[in-house]
Amino acid sequence: MSELNYEELGLKVGLEIHQQLNTSHKLFCNCSTNLKEDYKLTLERYLRPALSELGEVDVAALFEWKKGKKYVYRIPITTSCLVEADEEPPHAINEEALKIALAIAIALNSNIVDEIYVMRKIVIDGSNTTGFQRTAIVALGGMLKDEGVTIQTIAVEEDAARKIDEGTDQVTYSLDRLGIPLIEISTGPDIRSPEQAERVALKIGQLLRMTGKVKRGIGTIRQDLNISIKGGTKIEIKGVQKLELIPDIVRYEAMRQFNLLKIKEELNKRGVSKNLILSNFVVKDLTELFKNTNSKIIKSGIEKGGLVYGIRAYKLKGILGWELIPKKRRFGTEIADYVRALAELGGLFHSDELPNYGITEEEINKVREALNATTEDGFILIVGERERLDKAVEVIRDRILLAFDGIPKETRGALDDGTTKFLRPQPSSARMYPETDIPPRRIDEKLLEDAKKFVPESPESKMKRYITLGLSEELAKEIIRDPRLDLFEELVNKYSPKVSPVVIASTITNTLKYVKSKGGDISKINEEDIEELIKSVYENKISKDSISEILLEYTTNKNVELKDVIRKYEALPTEELEKIIDDVISSNLDEIRKRKDKAVNLIMSKVMSKVKGRAEGKVILELIKSRLKNVME
């Protein structure tokens, strides 16, 4: 993928970091914040939008309501109560969560509000039994100084219910996650490159982890991105779980938006308008035409009682297949996403990708004839039941018309390959209204003093402290930049001074680079694996010099467990090590006498190759020197 000039493009990126807080109980009740599957009962709800305090209905809420889905909630015994079921008013806001949020606000030089007011944010996708999420702004403004990125808001809010399953008409959630305290940090649109977006997310994540009061693991932190380019509009991208995906998401989204603007230009060049699209919009039932087709998808749809609709796309030849992201997404993919989300139909084909999928040239010609399509026109085929097809036709028409505006205002979901898909229209400002069951909480001096206990150490202070621990300036800088900085702190607290902080830092940084350079799959290594190795050194089970070899063997063999590799590299008993050294010396006596004092390096090399990290290099060297001294005498 060729790199765009982001400065010329006018790229602007803002981040919203959502991190679960590790508090003793939930935000508005006393239930545990652990996830549990111990449910015996369920409850069912249908949700509908409410008016905001401005008397308006949010478009995103309206979109979800139109799906008409039933929501089923599993009720865990130990991690939910009547508050989660919306059968009891919320309790007072969790003071511990407030203190953690205030600590982060202090660290980011934000302006802390005088009073905290809880608001209701309308959300009716079923992720909350109430139809809204409770949220409260704690601070405004602030700065991530070394990146020049402003902080807009810091808020505490309740996490959503955990989605278990989703079908056509029903979604199942668990209430165990609902109400876990989250901190939300929103930056200004000051980020100017994909790499900077990753750095900013990393630094905010590190700041949060260094409080020692946030949860860790998959699903505990989520990054949302707001991305725009010159001539476009802000696009929200939800649910980025992996930090390393952020640069690709920014690159791909910038490219997608750039090409959507190019399509807008091309439509203008062709002299096409919205009115011409509408006046030449032809829809035909082509089921009979495809009754003997070899296309498996169409054939299967017809056999299930479905129909095949053909839609003329006036003067859109080449537009439907226009690559928005090379080899990943076309304009036709965007239309298919809308149809999937709004009409709940798959099985969409367009003329720029045919003949393919079992659809022949002869069938294509018949479709063109039936739709009165010229060589300048495109067409779309879609399969399904009549009711959904009628809805799909409206969706396709509306998405084609949106192409004349360039970039539609959307909320999109992050995918594992760094691309995104349409989720829903962007929510408007008409989604907030005050929470009437919770009184305001004034920020007093005692609360601020308590919060200061959680304020994380500054990078400059860390650098000085790490150097006093024995790290070189270069290694100290490297560990401060590393995503596993908080793991380093944790392991140093647990296992030093017996295991040197230098060994711990080197394992997390340099050793992992070495393993990767040798072909190891370092994505296989998690934080628990690193701790297991450091703990094994601490307990004298293995030598620190064996860490790199253990990790290399572990990451280059798919079907091995770390504990088995560690067992293989357990430290040699002194007697066995001495025997290996004696054997090497006796096998190289002539060379030793010839090299004299320089023989140490030769013997050291040969012993190390036999020991393979199962003994400390320092210990081996001392034993070799003492034995060579006897030989030389």
Swiss-Prot record:
Its EC number is 6.3.5.-. One of its GO terms (molecular function) is glutaminyl-tRNA synthase (glutamine-hydrolyzing) activity. Keywords: ATP-binding, Ligase, Nucleotide-binding, Protein biosynthesis. GO terms for biological process: glutaminyl-tRNAGln biosynthesis via transamidation; translation. It comes from the Archaea. It is an enzyme of class 6 (ligase). One of its GO terms (cellular component) is cytoplasm. SMART domains: GatB_Yqey (SM00845). PROSITE patterns: GATB (PS01234). It catalyses: L-glutamyl-tRNA(Gln) + L-glutamine + ATP + H2O = L-glutaminyl-tRNA(Gln) + L-glutamate + ADP + phosphate + H(+). Gene3D superfamilies: 1.10.10.410, GAD-like domain, GatB domain, N-terminal subdomain. Belongs to the GatB/GatE family. GatE subfamily. Allows the formation of correctly charged Gln-tRNA(Gln) through the transamidation of misacylated Glu-tRNA(Gln) in organisms which lack glutaminyl-tRNA synthetase. The reaction takes place in the presence of glutamine and ATP through an activated gamma-phospho-Glu-tRNA(Gln). The GatDE system is specific for glutamate and does not act on aspartate. NCBIfam families: gatE_arch, PRK04028.1. Heterodimer of GatD and GatE. This is Glutamyl-tRNA(Gln) amidotransferase subunit E. The gene is gatE.
